[in-house]
């Protein structure tokens, strides 16, 4: 349940922008 920062990179990437 520690996917807070991981989910951020998965969805927003390194630039903090939505990868979708």
Curated annotation (Swiss-Prot):
Domain of life (superkingdom): Eukaryota
Disulphide bond pairs: none
Keyword Nucleotidyltransferase belongs to the record: no
UniProt pathway: Energy metabolism; oxidative phosphorylation
Membrane topology of the entry: Single-pass membrane protein
Alphabetical GO biological process terms: oxidative phosphorylation
EC category name: translocase
Subcellular location: Mitochondrion inner membrane
Keyword field: Membrane, Mitochondrion, Mitochondrion inner membrane, Translocase
Catalyzed reactions per annotation: 4 Fe(II)-[cytochrome c] + O2 + 8 H(+)(in) = 4 Fe(III)-[cytochrome c] + 2 H2O + 4 H(+)(out)
Entry EC no(s): 7.1.1.9
GO-annotated cellular components: mitochondrial inner membrane
Gene Ontology MF, one: cytochrome-c oxidase activity
Membrane in keyword set: yes
Family stated for the protein in its record: Belongs to the cytochrome c oxidase VIIb family.
Subunit structure: Component of the cytochrome c oxidase (complex IV, CIV), a multisubunit enzyme composed of 14 subunits. The complex is composed of a catalytic core of 3 subunits MT-CO1, MT-CO2 and MT-CO3, encoded in the mitochondrial DNA, and 11 supernumerary subunits COX4I, COX5A, COX5B, COX6A, COX6B, COX6C, COX7A, COX7B, COX7C, COX8 and NDUFA4, which are encoded in the nuclear genome.
Role: Component of the cytochrome c oxidase, the last enzyme in the mitochondrial electron transport chain which drives oxidative phosphorylation. The respiratory chain contains 3 multisubunit complexes succinate dehydrogenase (complex II, CII), ubiquinol-cytochrome c oxidoreductase (cytochrome b-c1 complex, complex III, CIII) and cytochrome c oxidase (complex IV, CIV), that cooperate to transfer electrons derived from NADH and succinate to molecular oxygen, creating an electrochemical gradient over the inner membrane that drives transmembrane transport and the ATP synthase.
Name of the protein described by the UniProt record: Cytochrome c oxidase subunit 7B-heart, mitochondrial
Species of provenance: Thunnus obesus (Bigeye tuna)
């Amino acid at each position: 349940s520690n996917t807070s920062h991981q989910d951020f990179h998965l969805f927003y990437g390194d630039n903090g922008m939505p990868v979708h």
